[in-house]
Amino acid sequence: MSILISPDNNTGWGLCSAGMYGGAKRRSSQHPVRVRGHYRAPWGAYTRGVISRRTTVDDVIDSVVADAQRYTRPVATSTVDSVIDSVVANARRYAQRKRRLQRRRRRPTAAMTAARAVLRRAQRIGRRAMRRAAASASAGRARRQAARQAAAAIASMAQPRRGNIYWVRDASGVRVPVRSRPPRS
């Protein structure tokens, strides 16, 4: 008598009693059940010339599809909460930017204001000289003359002037520096 053992793919193979008990008719302590008498390849190892139609790309596609099927949308957040959060974040960012700007800005020293005034005056004189020269002479000579006059103005401004500086209140009551001595009243 032989027994049909059917694995999950139902190919099956027959075992007679001689194969089952090592040649004995019944099982005994001398003839225990024989589990495996030789190497057995795993199921699906020998396909008898049938070539697998699947590739590694198919596996990747299957995994992507499985991930997409398992995907659940995140719980919708309250729009009021999100608006409040964004307003708070923007306010913090604005405060940080303002703090950074305040740290960077320094009050100009007297030397800086004087240098700025010298530069402004030299530019004004240079522009005036350029206009004057352009009206009367050729452009090349005018440019050279204007440059010469501007250089002279800068040099004269750079030299320290003699004389005292007096602080006088103007019409609005603000104290301003003046070189000429105010009249005694």
Swiss-Prot record:
Residues annotated with Phosphothreonine modification: 55
Site (Cleavage) found at 23-24
What does the record's miscellaneous section state? Answer: All late proteins expressed from the major late promoter are produced by alternative splicing and alternative polyadenylation of the same gene giving rise to non-overlapping ORFs. A leader sequence is present in the N-terminus of all these mRNAs and is recognized by the viral shutoff protein to provide expression although conventional translation via ribosome scanning from the cap has been shut off in the host cell.
Residues with the modification N-acetylserine, per the entry, are: 2
One GO BP:
symbiont entry into host cell
Q: How does it assemble?
A: Interacts with the core-capsid bridging protein; this interaction bridges the virus core to the capsid. Interacts with host NPM1; this interaction might play a role in placing the pre-histone-like nucleoprotein on the viral DNA or regulating viral gene expression. Interacts with host HMGB1; this interaction inhibits host immune response.
**GO MF annotations in UniProt:** DNA binding
Inducing factors: Expressed in the late phase of the viral replicative cycle.
Renumbered to this chain, motif Nuclear localization signal spans 175-185
Query: Modified residue Phosphoserine is at which positions?
Result: 172
Which residues are assigned to the propeptide feature?
2-23
Which species does this protein come from?
Human adenovirus F serotype 40 (HAdV-40)
Pfam families named in the record: Adeno_VII
Q: Name one GO cellular component term.
A: viral capsid
The name under which this protein is listed is Pre-histone-like nucleoprotein
